[in-house]
Amino acid sequence: SAPGGWSQVVSKELNGTGSIIAIDILDMPKIKDVKFIKSDLREFDQNKLNQPIDVVISDIAPNISGVRFIDDTNMIDLLEIELSIVDKTLVKGGNFLAKCFEGGSSEFLRKEINKRFKIMKRLKPDSSRKISKEIYLLGLNKN
């Protein structure tokens, strides 16, 4: 999907009542109420996020090699960066949504969400192909 899909949804939902920061390695079309930062998340200076954040949404995934162990390892590396952002900036009571792969990376993320949030949910959007290992895990109400 094109960069900015989640940002469009959140912008429409907030309708000007909040601020949105989007970070993507690819260019993204201008979206109302969205501050866009073009960066590879692995190289991003998290100090630029110098404000409390209510919700972190991540739709990031590594390039797929087709080798499950490598793909899971690469996904976990990205999830660790996302969790670092959650730990540094997400407010108490905040929420976190992240893409992962069913299996190794989802088990890792499940454990990490359970440590940090009161509620954890597994989501598979209707738009996701049935054979796809891609799922989302949602952490609600950060401790």
Over which residues does each language-model region extend?
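Glycine-centered, small-residue-biased loops immediately flanking beta-strands
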Residues: 18, 94
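Conserved SAM-binding loop of SAM-dependent methyltransferases across substrates and taxa
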Residues: 2-15
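Conserved helix-to-beta-strand junction in the class I
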Residues: 13-14, 85-92, 99, 116
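S-adenosyl-L-methionine
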Residues: 19, 23-65
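Mobile active-site "lid"/loop adjacent to the S-adenosyl-L-methionine
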Residues: 39, 51-93, 104
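Short, ordered loop/turn segments at secondary-structure junctions
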Residues: 1, 25-26, 41, 61, ...
